[in-house]
């Protein structure tokens, strides 16, 4: 090197810096930083620096990212190493020095482009020495970052927590699904940035709104390409771990590399969880939200059609959308300087069909407040999102002669139960009030009137309330059903009929049951029952019946729900009364016993018990246990068969390796069902701390 100033090595102090930047869970070897926050490096020179005084005055650092780094697009920065640092832009200041070592504090801008960076040392404006690579992420801890979150508990939950829940089931029977987001798994950051690299507008990667929309659009496209149809699901049902849905990382690997876990049509709700993983990994606070009884495919219409045959079973889909049992979405937190004041905070990531406007045209980012206030003009996706939680359902009866008859339906309104995980707790939180005003309130009335006027102005109004079908000779019907039915067991149904007139009525009653998937798609017709009776003047009649698996024409498919319906008509009119309820299918209880605290590197025993309350044997039982920081790899054990009325009791031992709150998940699969899951959390402490 002659007499030129040269670098021997550079110490990035990855472990220490990552600790300060809340990224130690990602890596202790690779420097991973959050923007707008300083970090420390040590430059080790080959010779004493005092012999190169003239060169020292021209020493600078270069930070660059992307395929074609440029100052113009903010993907390259050249900044001097001085004794003073600039807290607003890229800067470097010497903190300590001796003959051959400099300790330098480097500060990144709070609006820097995120991604993988190279850091170089430049001497005299010419010679450059590569120092190494680092990764820059968004910073919810920095008040000036657009993703700043004020509350530390919320930052911990929405950025750092790798364990969560997705809420499935029905509005009356919410079922928690333990979910491993795994945003800090070793390859997730690289996979997330690989996904982002499909967008060539690297200069816009400093804007969380842009990044979130890109993530939403690209994941949606990958899902469309990768999700397998139900027919393939059924054909491959005997294949390996078909219905496993334990976490985001295997799915993300499959979508981006082809090596991971496939997703099937009946599980496509997992895409929200995968998006949540990527956003949290990149430093954008995110959470998965479930809307029960959600109107989908409405194109903004506030009326949804459903069609049922004379047996009370669903008969195709309406032209104005349909009602999903539940729908999952992902919200992310950020300021929105591109919108009017007041629209920052939680934003809904809403992928949609491409419209020719590039990748961003395939995904909207809609403020939750805009949905609540019915601001249809704010974003093209607002009308559809508003309808998802405010639409009304119109039920039609398809007669044998091909005619359609409007029913007098008491179908519940949609979007009255919206849930997510409570911060710092394993409980479920109802956040419906974020999306809509209380039913019957003055605010709700004002918003609905505003939306109706806006739709009229746009020429899209088709009415906001279901058409009236009150008969001159009425019959009233009320339908009650259990919120869930045990697998292979019975559920209770009751129909109350009221004749408010002075004339006797001959009533035809049909009760039906069918299996459907979470997205409202019919899976199978299962059962129907007809009754004919006379209802006396002013009589109230209550009819009860058992809904039994033993009466079903076939076993409901995995991941399906039951929709039970009641349809009544009487002789003097063709008008039918209609009511329906969705029922979750309950599985046996899984009881897990484990200490709440455990010592790191010391064996821990867990006990698992399960009772077969079904009327049939549970054959080919397989139990799986897994948990990051607790078990190195998933453990699977064959347990044979469990006969009706008998119980299973087994124990496992493992050695925790990671400190902090960890989650153990236990899963049982058999010929009767898949994905019977339970979990327990354990606080792992250092060995010297008393347990």
Swiss-Prot record:
KW Glycoprotein (keyword) present: no
An annotated Gene Ontology molecular function: protein-glutamine gamma-glutamyltransferase activity
Ranges for region Band 3 binding: 31-39
PROSITE patterns noted in UniProt: TRANSGLUTAMINASES
Subunit details: Component of the ankyrin-1 complex in the erythrocyte, composed of ANK1, RHCE, RHAG, SLC4A1, EPB42, GYPA, GYPB and AQP1. Interacts with SLC4A1 (via the cytoplasmic domain); this interaction is mediated by the SLC4A1 Band 3-I dimer. Interacts with ANK1 (via ANK 1-13 repeats). Interacts with AQP1 (via the C-terminal).
Matching PANTHER family: PROTEIN 4.2, PROTEIN-GLUTAMINE GAMMA-GLUTAMYLTRANSFERASE
Family indicated by similarity: Belongs to the transglutaminase superfamily. Transglutaminase family.
Name of the featured protein: Protein 4.2
């Amino acid at each position: 090197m002659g007499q030129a100033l040269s670098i021997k090595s550079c110490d990035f102090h990855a472990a220490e810096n990552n600790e300060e930047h809340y990224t130690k869970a990602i890596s202790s070897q690779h420097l991973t930083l959050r923007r707008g926050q300083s970090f420390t490096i040590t430059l080790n020179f080959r010779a004493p620096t005092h012999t190169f005084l003239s060169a020292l005055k021209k020493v600078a650092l270069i930070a660059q990212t992307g395929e074609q780094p440029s100052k113009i697009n903010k993907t390259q920065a050249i900044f001097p190493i001085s004794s003073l640092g600039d807290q607003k832009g890229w800067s470097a200041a010497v903190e300590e020095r001796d003959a051959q070592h400099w300790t330098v504090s480097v500060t990144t801008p709070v609006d820097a482009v995120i991604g993988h960076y190279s850091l170089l040392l430049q001497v005299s404006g010419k010679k450059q020495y590569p120092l190494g690579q680092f990764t820059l992420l968004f910073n919810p801890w920095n008040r000036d970052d657009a993703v700043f979150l004020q509350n530390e508990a919320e930052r911990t939950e929405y950025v750092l927590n790798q364990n969560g829940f997705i809420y499935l089931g029905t509005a009356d029977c919410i079922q928690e699904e333990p979910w491993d987001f795994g945003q800090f798994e070793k390859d997730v950051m690289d996979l997330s940035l690989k996904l982002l690299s499909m967008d060539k507008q690297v200069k816009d990667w400093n804007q969380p709104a842009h990044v979130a929309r890109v993530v939403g659009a690209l994941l949606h496209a990958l899902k469309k390409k990768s999700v397998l149809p139900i027919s393939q699901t059924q054909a491959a049902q005997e294949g390996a771990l078909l219905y496993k849905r334990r976490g985001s990382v295997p799915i993300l690997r499959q979508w981006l590399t082809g090596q991971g876990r496939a997703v099937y049509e009946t599980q496509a709700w997992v895409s929200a969880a995968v998006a949540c993983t990527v956003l949290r990994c990149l430093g954008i606070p995110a959470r998965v939200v479930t809307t029960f009884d959600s109107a989908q495919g409405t194109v903004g219409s506030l009326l949804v059609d459903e069609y049922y045959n004379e047996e009370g079973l669903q008969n195709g889909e309406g032209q104005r959308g349909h009602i999903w049992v539940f729908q999952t979405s992902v919200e992310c937190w950020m300021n929105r300087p591109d919108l009017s004041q007041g629209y920052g905070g939680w934003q809904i990531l809403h992928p949609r069909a491409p419209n020719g406007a590039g990748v961003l045209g395939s995904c909207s980012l809609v403020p939750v407040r805009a949905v609540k206030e019915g601001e249809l003009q704010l974003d093209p996706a607002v009308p559809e999102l508003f309808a998802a939680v405010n639409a009304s359902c119109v039920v039609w009866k398809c007669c044998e002669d091909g005619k359609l008859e409007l029913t007098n339906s008491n179908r519940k309104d949609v979007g009255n139960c919206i849930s997510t995980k409570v911060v710092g707790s394993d409980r479920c939180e109802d956040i419906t009030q974020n999306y809509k005003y209380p039913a019957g309130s003055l605010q709700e009335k004002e918003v609905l009137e505003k939306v109706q006027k806006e739709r009229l102005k746009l020429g899209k109004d088709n009415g906001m309330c279901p058409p009236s079908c009150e008969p001159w000779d009425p019959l009233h019907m009320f339908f009650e059903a259990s919120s869930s039915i045990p697998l292979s067991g019975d559920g209770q149904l009751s129909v109350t009929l009221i004749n408010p007139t002075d004339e006797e009525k001959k009533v035809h009653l049909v009760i039906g049951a069918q299996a459907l998937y979470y997205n409202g798609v019919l899976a199978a017709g299962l059962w129907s029952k007809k009754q004919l009776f006379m209802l006396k003047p002013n009589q109230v009649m209550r009819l009860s019946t058992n809904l039994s698996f033993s009466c079903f024409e076939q076993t409901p498919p995995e991941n399906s729900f039951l929709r039970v319906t009641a349809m009544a008509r009487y002789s003097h009119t063709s008008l039918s009364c209609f009511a329906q309820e969705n029922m979750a299918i309950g599985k046996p209880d899984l009881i897990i016993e484990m200490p709440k605290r455990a010592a790191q590197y010391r064996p821990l025993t867990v006990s698992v018990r399960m009772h077969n309350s079904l009327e049939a044997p549970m054959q080919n039982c397989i139990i799986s246990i897994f948990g990051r920081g607790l078990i190195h790899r998933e453990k699977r054990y064959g347990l044979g068969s469990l006969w009706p009325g008998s119980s299973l009791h087994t124990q496992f031992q493992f050695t925790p390796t990671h400190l902090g709150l960890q989650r153990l998940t236990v899963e049982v699969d058999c010929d009767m069902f898949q994905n019977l899951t339970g979990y327990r959390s354990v606080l792992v402490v250092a060995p010297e701390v008393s347990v």
